């Protein structure tokens, strides 16, 4: 009988805890429209179109840089290549270095790294253009081999 009373007391305590503890499967009612989630995501279609237009715009610059040498063409080619490479690397990092995949700190470091790489690329190309033969003359020298 004593064991039965102990079990009954234990059962009553468990029942009391179960009544006062929050439920894990509580139904939460939420009202939403269909476009609520979609409005929070930025639209990258315009950026994608701009990248494609930029790439198409680079098509005449590359052959022209073989025939036209000088600081202006070097600067145009430097800016065009730097932006094209930056957008490409940024797209890869944006797609594959998301915070929920690699962690918040690593994702932030990857995005900062994109801008560091772009800055170093721009500085290196500008240094090459001003202190050496320049990009267009370098292309001519490479193709003359």
Curated annotation (Swiss-Prot):
Q: Where, in this chain's numbering, is heme bound?
A: 84
> Which Pfam family is an annotated match for this chain, by its short name?
CybS
Listed Gene3D superfamilies: Fumarate reductase/succinate dehydrogenase, transmembrane subunit
Tell where it localizes.
Mitochondrion inner membrane
Q: Which residues lie on this side of the membrane: Mitochondrial matrix?
A: 1-52, 95-108
UniProt keywords (A-Z) are:
Electron transport, Heme, Iron, Membrane, Metal-binding, Mitochondrion, Mitochondrion inner membrane, Transit peptide, Transmembrane, Transmembrane helix, Transport, Tricarboxylic acid cycle
GO cellular component term, pick one: respiratory chain complex II (succinate dehydrogenase)
- Asked whether the UniProt record includes Mitochondrion among its keywords, one would answer yes
Describe which pathway this protein belongs to, using the record's wording.
Answer: Carbohydrate metabolism; tricarboxylic acid cycle
The residues that the entry says bind a ubiquinone are: 96
Span-the-membrane segments of this chain are: 53-69, 76-94, 109-129
The source's domain of life comes to: Eukaryota
Topological domains annotated Mitochondrial intermembrane: 70-75, 130-145
**What is the membrane topology listed in the Swiss-Prot or TrEMBL record?**
Multi-pass membrane protein
Any one GO molecular function term: heme binding
Q: GO biological process: what's one of them?
A: tricarboxylic acid cycle
Reply yes or no: does the keyword tRNA processing apply.
no
Which family, according to UniProt? Answer: Belongs to the CybS family.
Q: How does it assemble?
A: Forms part of complex II containing four subunits: a flavoprotein (FP), an iron-sulfur protein (IP) and a cytochrome b composed of a large and a small subunit.
Query: What function is annotated for this protein?
Result: Membrane-anchoring subunit of succinate dehydrogenase (SDH) that is involved in complex II of the mitochondrial electron transport chain and is responsible for transferring electrons from succinate to ubiquinone (coenzyme Q).
Name by which UniProt lists this protein: Putative succinate dehydrogenase [ubiquinone] cytochrome b small subunit, mitochondrial
Q: Which gene holds the coding sequence for this protein?
A: sdhd-1
